[in-house]
């Protein structure tokens, strides 16, 4: 392979990586979680992804807490949260990129955590069951 062809191929690959990196830098979703378990009930939660632990949080009734998640190029970004209150313990995939991107692309993904399960309030209310215990 001649040196000029090698430089051209290398330049195209470098530009492609830079372009993907710049596009990825602007892809994110904001998640907002609301404690709607009930009056006088504190909600404990701990959210994580494969590579990021957001730490334990505690929310008073109707209090909000949120985070911003960067989305990956494979559309597989996943954050899950463990919720505890009184004698209950549940977990849920609070951010699944393929499920939430269209609805939460321009507005925060707002989740109301209720005894019956989490409900996404963004766009129109949609409730989901919690994940099964393992």
Swiss-Prot record:
The keyword Secreted applies. This is S-protein homolog 18. InterPro entries: Self-incomp_S1. GO terms for biological process: rejection of self pollen. Keywords: Glycoprotein, Secreted, Self-incompatibility, Signal. Residues 1-25 form the signal peptide. Pfam families: Self-incomp_S1.
């Amino acid at each position: 392979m001649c040196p000029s062809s090698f430089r051209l191929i290398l330049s195209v690959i470098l530009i492609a990586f830079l372009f993907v990196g710049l596009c990825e830098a602007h892809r994110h979703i904001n998640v907002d979680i609301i404690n709607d378990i009930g009056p006088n009930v504190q909600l404990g939660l701990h959210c994580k992804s494969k590579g990021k632990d957001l730490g334990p949080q505690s929310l008073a009734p109707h209090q909000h807490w949120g985070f911003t998640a960067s989305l990956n190029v494979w559309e597989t970004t996943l954050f899950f949260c463990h919720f505890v209150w009184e004698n209950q313990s549940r977990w849920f995939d609070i951010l699944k990129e393929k499920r939430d991107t269209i609805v939460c692309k321009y507005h925060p993904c707002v989740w109301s955590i209720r005894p019956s399960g989490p409900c996404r309030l963004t766009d129109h209310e949609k409730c989901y069951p919690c994940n099964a215990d393992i």
